[in-house]
From Swiss-Prot:
PANTHER family: COBALT-PRECORRIN-5B C(1)-METHYLTRANSFERASE. InterPro entries: CbiD, CbiD_sf. The gene is cbiD. It catalyses: Co-precorrin-5B + S-adenosyl-L-methionine = Co-precorrin-6A + S-adenosyl-L-homocysteine. It comes from Methanospirillum hungatei JF-1 (strain ATCC 27890 / DSM 864 / NBRC 100397 / JF-1). Its EC number is 2.1.1.195. Pathway: Cofactor biosynthesis; adenosylcobalamin biosynthesis; cob(II)yrinate a,c-diamide from sirohydrochlorin (anaerobic route): step 6/10. One of its GO terms (molecular function) is cobalt-precorrin-5B C1-methyltransferase activity. GO terms for biological process: anaerobic cobalamin biosynthetic process; methylation. Gene3D superfamilies: CbiD-like (3.30.2110.10), CbiD-like domains (3.40.50.10720). Pfam families: CbiD. This is Cobalt-precorrin-5B C(1)-methyltransferase. The lineage of its organism: Archaea, Methanobacteriati, Methanobacteriota, Stenosarchaea group, Methanomicrobia. Belongs to the CbiD family. Transmembrane segments: none annotated. Keywords: Cobalamin biosynthesis, Methyltransferase, S-adenosyl-L-methionine, Transferase.
Length: 335
């Protein structure tokens, strides 16, 4: 059995310990993660998937009634059914966090309002959706804080609904009434997002991190002969290409708790932000930049990255660090 989200092939002994066929089905569909003792942890849905469901529901409700869930295609390529509530021209989706107890956006309601149009599709973001307070390498001041993957997911959901209803065009507005309040519990303001939450999600799923699952990840890493730890799905994809003979494991922000358990050679591979802030938490101090992504546009970045490599390697000589950009090119290698 393979996890369709991460690509991890579950060991037979783990599968044999999971005797509930319903739970096995959830795992095979990517809706849950199987742990080393045979129990499962359910994945939740990202803000991007939740907003997509609300948007699709709002468009469908222009011509349809009597439905309480919609089908959306996640960025991971997995189609899921997400519960919604509707009124004519309005769709709402309450964000489901799965078995991730630390999800501060759990339960947040996304609302979408759809208005028929003569042609084309218009998408706008309103109250509770954060906006960038300054220019960044990928966004301009005032742009909604919606990642590229989430934006594509939302637009695809709207287009599916337009095709299903047969209407010539539509205008959709997405908002989250409690978004500004919830955003106060996040790091948005530190990275330059104000007025609400970010709409994110590289896979469409929220990983069910807890102490139990962390131990399972440790078990996987300890038993692997050659291991690459990644910080996210993009890093995972490129790590598989760069290191095809290694076991690639999604560690997320748990690098610091997993690496001490490993005694052999280890590779950390991922995008700059999480990797560099893990190996050198103070890399941005004195730079005048708030994010690693912004720092990357400055001539001081590459020397700072090399210095960070040297400092970390002096304490962890068995760990190699490989930093890639969003196109998969290696921009830094401690080897």
């Amino acid at each position: 059995m393979q996890d369709p989200v991460s690509g991890f092939i579950y060991p037979e002994e783990w599968i044999s310990l999971c005797t509930d066929e319903t739970e096995r089905l959830l795992v095979s569909q990517g809706l849950a993660v199987l742990t080393s003792d045979g129990t499962i942890r359910r994945r939740g849905f990202t803000t991007g998937s939740s907003a997509s469901a609300a948007a699709k529901a709002s468009v469908l409700s222009l011509t349809k009634t009597g439905f309480d869930e919609v089908s959306i295609l996640t960025p991971a390529g997995i189609r899921v059914q997400i519960p919604v509530t509707i009124a004519r021209g309005t769709g709402e989706c309450r964000k489901y966090s799965g078995d991730y107890p630390g999800d501060v956006t759990a339960g947040l309601v996304f609302t979408a309002e759809a208005t028929p149009a003569d042609s084309g599709t218009t998408l706008v973001f309103g109250e509770g959706i954060g906006r960038w307070s300054r220019d960044t390498p990928r966004y301009k001041t005032g742009d909604p804080a919606v990642s590229c993957q989430a934006m594509d997911e939302i637009k695809n959901a709207i287009e599916e609904a337009v095709q299903e209803t047969g209407i010539p065009g539509v205008s959709v507005r997405i908002f989250a009434r409690e978004g500004r309040i919830v955003a106060e519990k996040t790091l948005n303001q530190m990275v330059g997002v104000v007025g609400g939450i970010s709409v994110l999600g590289t896979t469409g799923f929220v990983e069910p991190w807890d102490d139990h699952l962390e131990q399972t990840v440790c078990d996987r890493a300890v038993h692997a002969e050659r291991v690459v730890l990644t910080t996210g799905r993009i890093g995972m994809r490129y790590a598989r290409m760069l290191f095809p003979d290694h076991e690639v494991i999604l560690a997320g922000s748990r690098l610091g708790t997993i690496i001490p358990h490993l005694t052999g050679e280890v590779i950390i591979c991922g995008l700059p932000a999480l990797v560099l802030k893990y190996i050198n938490p103070v890399i941005l101090e004195g730079t005048g930049f708030s994010t690693v992504e912004e720092f990357m546009t400055n001539d001081r970045f590459l020397p700072a990255m090399q210095t960070s490599f040297q400092i970390y390697k002096s304490a962890h000589p068995n760990v190699r660090i490989v930093v890639v950009n969003r196109e998969g090119a290696i921009i830094g290698d401690s080897q």
